[in-house]
Regions:
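C-terminal substrate-binding/active-site "lid" region of AdoMet-derived donor-dependent transferases
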Residues: 60-135
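General small-molecule cofactor/ligand-binding pocket signal
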Residues: 7, 30-32, 117
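S-adenosyl-L-methionine
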Residues: 11-49
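Short, well-ordered alpha-helix to beta-strand connector turns
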Residues: 3, 47, 78-81
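Conserved SAM-binding motif I beta-strand of class I
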Residues: 4-10
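Generic beta-sheet signal
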Residues: 9, 53, 84-86
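A short SAM/SAH-binding and catalytic strip from SAM-dependent methyltransferases
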Residues: 37, 45-63, 89
Length: 136
């Protein structure tokens, strides 16, 4: 299948600037500086691939909804969809508010209907990195 649209959302304007003008300047990507949980939730309805390589900076994925404004949680609005999520056990970094100790603890943060297809742990000097790839 062909990729129809890529949207990158980050609260850090420096990250968006670097991605837009240095890393992916030759790609057709929509870059948005903002909180993915506030204004941009409607993006979920057309998304079929979620990539979050910084889950340690956010609430657990199963807590991304439902919100008062939406009757259904995000994962029931997008099925079928795939995901690639990463987190780590680097608890000593101040901005890491949601680190996990184990891959199982990370899996427990997924919505109930998530099916993990690939999981991986990579040791790092600062703490283990965890990767989950699957479908909703």
């Amino acid at each position: 299948n062909e990729v129809k649209k890529i949207t990158c959302i980050d609260v850090d304007s420096d990250v968006i600037y670097r991605a837009k003008y240095e890393l992916f300047k030759d790609f057709d990507i929509d870059f948005i500086t903002g909180d993915v949980f506030e204004k941009y939730r409607d993006q979920y309805t057309t998304c079929d691939l979620f990539i979050n390589t910084s889950c340690e900076h956010m609430s657990p994925m199963k807590e991304w909804g439902p919100w008062p404004k939406y009757k259904n949680p995000w994962w029931s609005r997008v099925s079928p969809a795939y995901f690639a999520f990463q987190s780590n056990a680097m608890f000593d970094i101040p901005t890491h508010t949601n680190c996990v100790h184990t891959i199982q603890e990370f899996k427990d943060q997924l919505p109930e209907n998530a099916e993990v297809l690939i999981e991986d742990e990579v040791p790092d000097l600062r703490g283990t990195r965890f990767t989950l790839i699957g479908r909703l």
